[in-house]
Swiss-Prot record:
PANTHER family: ADENOSYLCOBINAMIDE-GDP RIBAZOLETRANSFERASE
The gene coding this protein: cobS
EC number: 2.7.8.26
Upper lineage: Archaea, Methanobacteriati, Methanobacteriota, Stenosarchaea group, Methanomicrobia
A GO term, aspect molecular function: cobalamin 5'-phosphate synthase activity
Required cofactor names: Mg(2+)
Organism: Methanococcoides burtonii (strain DSM 6242 / NBRC 107633 / OCM 468 / ACE-M)
Record protein name field: Adenosylcobinamide-GDP ribazoletransferase
Length: 271
């Protein structure tokens, strides 16, 4: 198998629950091709969007929102949510830098991690529900708009991870440091352009607004990580995935409302 195909297979093995397998050789090839993570976001986001379109078309909104959340974690797995929990433990730990880093790396889940995880799940549900309410009120294409918004959110989530990796410094050796050390600016730029292009094609101006909000979120997570841990690890990268997805959906909800109320002169045209 060529290096590219091995990296492609590993991308989905690493970022999803699709049973394609994963190996250290594949990870070595993947970190050389960071843009494949954004490509995975496009594919996974499309799958989530299609699922959301079907549930929005045939089921009540509340049930649809819950099922969308279930499908997101069914297809993407819980690794990044677990990273958010570890990040919460580290960020809320009191004491020295060493204690914070130890809490970040600790395999057990504390009250800080539980709180961050629960709040993130509540926020994800709230963001999906708010998006549903706005598009149902303003548009006859509600299911399509929700599907496209979820696509952009997933692309943004994956680009947020690459942003943290590209601009952060590792605090210890491991899988996270492999990704961080190999996410060079040229590789990051390729993934950034790929993600931006798809978001613009899918949702016009609103697409790029949502995408940029994910990048901004990543820099906020990076800043918090540096303040607490003096660097980043894989948990910090995973945290950016979870938080960016939520922020993109919230920003798109606000932007869609503004557009439909006639503010800002923004226009969007779903494909």
């Amino acid at each position: 198998m060529s290096g590219f195909l091995l990296a492609l297979r590993t991308t989905f093995g690493f970022l999803s629950t699709i049973p394609v397998g994963m190996s250290m050789e594949g990870l070595d090839e993947l970190v050389k091709r960071s843009y494949l993570q954004t490509f995975a976001g496009i594919v996974l986001g499309s799958m989530i969007g299609i699922f959301a379109y079907l549930t929005e078309s045939f089921l009540p909104s509340t049930i649809s929102a819950v099922l969308i959340m279930v499908f997101i974690y069914y297809i993407t797995g819980l690794n990044h949510l677990d990273g958010l929990g570890d990040f919460g433990d580290g960020a809320t730990a009191h004491g020295s830098l060493e204690k914070k880093v130890n809490a970040l790396k600790d395999m057990s889940l504390g009250i800080g991690g539980v709180s961050y995880t629960v709040l993130a799940l509540i926020a994800l549900y709230a963001s999906i529900s708010s998006l549903q309410a706005e598009v149902l009120f303003f548009s006859d294409n509600a299911a399509l708009i929700i599907a496209i918004s979820l696509l952009i959110a997933e692309i943004g989530a994956k680009q947020a991870m690459l942003t943290v990796a590209a601009f952060g410094k590792p605090i210890h050796e491991g899988l996270g440091s492999m990704i961080i050390n190999n996410t060079t600016f040229p590789r990051y730029a390729v993934s950034f352009v790929l993600g931006a292009l798809v978001c613009v094609l899918a949702f016009g101006t609103l697409g790029i607004i949502g995408y940029i909000s994910a990048i901004v979120t990543a820099f906020v997570i990076l800043n918090i990580s540096i303040r607490h841990f003096k660097g980043i690890n894989g948990d910090c990268i995973g945290t950016s995935n979870e938080i960016a997805r939520i922020i993109v959906l919230m920003v798109l909800t606000v932007a869609i409302t503004a557009v439909n109320n006639g503010y800002g002169g923004l226009f969007w045209t779903p494909l």
